[in-house]
Amino acid sequence: MAAAGNRAEIIRGIFAAYLANDRASVEAAFAEDFRFSTPYGENIDKPRYFAECWRDSGWIGRHEIERIMVDGVEAYVTYHCVARDGKSFRNTEFFVFDGDKVSRIDVYFGPSHQDGELVRQDR
């Protein structure tokens, strides 16, 4: 996926793998004790993440990473996503690493828009 120790490249690799529906690469990037939190669920473990949160990326029309900031074992990534139906949103995710594996991701949702209008983001 990425050179060992380059956390920004590891994050880019995870996003590229997600967009390619490459679940095996994403699973390999996550630590065994991985935890995932969003406003809809807290401390979801790795098996539950793939059972309940993983979905085919065919709904995505365009996805752009806007910025990645790395500070030691922690990183933030902000991205803009446009769905094939025209809905768009910006999210920020907080990553924690254990070596070169991601041990935690906390997702912070931004607003969603469609046709220039603010819409409530569905789960």
Question: Which residues fall in each region the model found?
Answer:
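Short, low-complexity N-terminal intrinsically disordered segments enriched in polar/charged residues
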Residues: 1-24, 28, 32, 73, ...
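Acidic-and-aromatic substrate-binding clefts and catalytic sites of carbohydrate-active enzymes
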Residues: 42-44
